[in-house]
């Protein structure tokens, strides 16, 4: 059966909709452990409206979510069903070989086995397959789509699915919230897409231990809604639709990483199903352990290439007693970056330090009718007691004034804080609104904090000289910054210019002992930079690990490890 609404899959104004689901569960208490038990008989809900701004931002790019005419043939019938004319060939640095892949027909015997395992939670419907095979939030091209989409409900089903696919050597592509921008959910070799959205239970909450055990399909926003009544929260904040499983797979972070760290710092243990069907527990629930290899960190950031995550134990934090949001303008991005560095060097425990350049502020003004000063802007969030946060705010105001800061504003009341923070939250939406019909190439470089001002200044000079609309958005407290490079996907010249700018920033970051990706992951888009960043020996070690755990190369093929190194 087809699970998704045909209405939302058609070429209509609603084509940006993503399925959003409620927790299919009812709470019950077991001492200090709170368990959400699944409601029997509940199945995947149809597509519904999302309240987040993120789908609206992506919807502004009409080409990002255009669907193929429903009369197009299935990929399993013809490998030319998707247009690959724009794919570029370019030696070992090209992802062309990975994007195209080698298509192999899925045996009928495997589909029969999967139907036995999953009953109705399986579909070969073209619309559903295309929806899962197309990159929802990125410019990366899809040349193949999955032949089958499956929706497991338990770890046992995941184990059986992987074991069956491994027997027939059929590729498996794990699928979470689909908010990744580096092509992580592409299916270059077709195969089976394993959608984890039905596995979204909160299995246990340990309030006194400040940890929670969840299934991979739950979103971080859903989880925090559940945790709020206990005075706890999970402190990572990537894209609104991101699922916990996908966040582990990509080793993501967000604007709060400067205070709470990244995903690798906030996961205590995992359960992972390996390609042969074995279920591996990576660690105990203890806050620290010296027992054996750190399998938890091996899986975090592996992007579905080693197995499928089925259970996550997360470290939680207390909801802060008080917070202050502050905003300040600067004459140059270097001045703003210098203040971010000086703030961190002062020892102040900020929870957020975000930088937006004047082009980004202009986009927000144009898109939302605001009248903000169009200058490089720093945004801070301070948390703690009321007295402590006010003291932090005053110290940072003094630091900013020494670096030509002006128009320093801060807010403590909830509505006022929300209004100030909307400046940052509306940034991506504003870019799409300012360049309708365009796609965004979003960069993700990160450098040691001492090099941030130099990198942003160097990049800003190159961006301003380009004919493309380019904005800067940085997590300035930890050296990570993004640029939104808007380009017309129908213009090869603009695409090449966007790629050139991306290359420039990545190679600049690498020259400063930085990385090509601070939080978005490698996927297909960043593979070409890994050898320069890590060295061939590191890539060969990754290959040996992959070969040992996944000898048939069925797990998310064409991702993470460059094609000239892999099988």
Curated annotation (Swiss-Prot):
Residues 142-319 form the FAD-binding PCMH-type domain. This is D-lactate dehydrogenase [cytochrome], mitochondrial. The keyword Transport does not apply. Coiled coil: none annotated. Belongs to the FAD-binding oxidoreductase/transferase type 4 family. Its EC number is 1.1.2.4. One of its GO terms (cellular component) is plasma membrane. One of its GO terms (biological process) is methylglyoxal catabolic process. Keywords: FAD, Flavoprotein, Mitochondrion, Oxidoreductase, Transit peptide. Its cofactor is FAD. It is an enzyme of class 1 (oxidoreductase). Induction: By light. The lineage of its organism: Eukaryota, Viridiplantae, Streptophyta, Embryophyta, Tracheophyta. Disruption phenotype: No visible phenotype when grown under standard conditions, but developmental retardation and lethality when grown in presence of methylglyoxal or D-lactate. Inhibited by cyanide ions. It catalyses: (R)-lactate + 2 Fe(III)-[cytochrome c] = 2 Fe(II)-[cytochrome c] + pyruvate + 2 H(+). Residues 1-56 form a transit peptide. Catalyzes the stereospecific oxidation of D-lactate to pyruvate. Involved in the detoxification of methylglyoxal and D-lactate, but probably not involved in the metabolization of glycolate. It is found in: Mitochondrion. One of its GO terms (molecular function) is identical protein binding. Optimum pH is 8-9. Expressed in leaves, stems, flowers and roots. Binds 1 FAD per monomer. Homodimer. It comes from Arabidopsis thaliana (Mouse-ear cress).
């Amino acid at each position: 059966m087809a699970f998704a609404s045909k209405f939302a899959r058609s070429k209509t104004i609603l084509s940006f909709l993503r399925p959003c689901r409620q927790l299919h569960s009812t709470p019950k208490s077991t001492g200090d452990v709170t368990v959400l038990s699944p409601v029997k008989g509940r199945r995947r809900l149809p597509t519904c409206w999302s309240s987040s701004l993120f789908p609206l931002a992506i919807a502004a790019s009409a080409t990002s979510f255009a669907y193929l005419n429903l009369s197009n043939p299935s990929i399993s019938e013809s490998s030319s069903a998707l247009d690959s004319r724009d794919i570029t060939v370019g030696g070992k640095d090209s992802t062309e070989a990975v994007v195209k892949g080698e298509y192999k027909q899925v045996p009928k015997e495997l589909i029969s086995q999967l139907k036995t395992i999953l009953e109705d939670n399986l579909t070969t419907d073209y619309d559903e397959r295309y929806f899962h095979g197309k990159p929802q939030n990125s410019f990366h091209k899809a040349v193949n789509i999955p032949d089958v989409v499956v929706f497991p409900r338990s770890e046992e089903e995941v184990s059986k699915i992987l074991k069956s696919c491994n027997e027939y050597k059929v590729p498996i592509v794990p699928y979470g919230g689909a908010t990744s921008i580096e092509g992580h959910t592409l299916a270059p070799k077709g195969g089976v897409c394993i959608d984890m959205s039905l596995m979204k239970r909160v299995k246990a909450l340990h309030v006194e231990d400040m940890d929670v055990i969840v299934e991979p399909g739950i979103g971080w926003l859903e989880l925090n809604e559940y945790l709020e009544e206990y005075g706890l929260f999970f402190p990572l904040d990537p894209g609104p639709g991101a699922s916990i499983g996908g966040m582990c797979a990509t080793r993501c972070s967000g604007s709060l990483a400067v205070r709470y760290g990244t995903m690798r710092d906030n996961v205590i243990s995992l359960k992972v199903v390996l390609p042969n069907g074995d279920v591996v527990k990576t660690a105990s629930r203890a806050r620290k352990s010296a027992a054996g290899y750190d399998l938890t960190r091996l899986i975090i950031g592996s992007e579905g290439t080693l197995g499928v995550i089925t259970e996550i134990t997360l470290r939680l934090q207390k909801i802060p007693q008080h917070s202050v949001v502050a905003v300040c303008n600067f004459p140059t991005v270097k001045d703003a970056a210098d203040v971010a560095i000086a703030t961190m060097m002062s020892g102040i425990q900020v929870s957020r330090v975000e930088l937006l350049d004047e082009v980004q502020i202009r986009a927000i003004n144009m898109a939302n009718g605001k009248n903000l000063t169009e200058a490089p802007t720093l945004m801070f969030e301070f948390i703690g007691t009321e007295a402590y946060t006010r003291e932090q705010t005053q110290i940072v105001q003094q630091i900013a004034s020494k670096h030509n800061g002006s128009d320093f504003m801060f807010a403590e009341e909830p509505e006022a804080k929300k209004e100030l923070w909307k400046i940052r939250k509306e940034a991506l939406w504003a870019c799409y609104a300012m360049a309708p019909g365009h796609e965004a190439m979003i960069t993700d470089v990160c450098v040691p904090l001492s090099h941030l001002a130099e990198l942003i200044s160097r990049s800003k000079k190159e961006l301003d000289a380009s004919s493309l609309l380019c904005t800067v958005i940085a997590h300035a407290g930890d050296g990570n910054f993004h640029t939104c490079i808007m380009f017309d996907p129908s213009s090869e010249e603009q695409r090449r210019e966007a790629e050139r700018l991306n290359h420039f920033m990545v190679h600049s970051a690498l020259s400063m002992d930085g990385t090509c990706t601070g939080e978005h992951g490698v996927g297909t888009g960043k593979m070409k930079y890994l050898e320069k960043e890590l060295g061939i020996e590191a890539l060969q070690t990754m290959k040996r690990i992959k070969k040992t755990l996944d000898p048939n190369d069925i797990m998310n093929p064409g991702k993470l490890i460059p094609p000239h190194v892999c099988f």
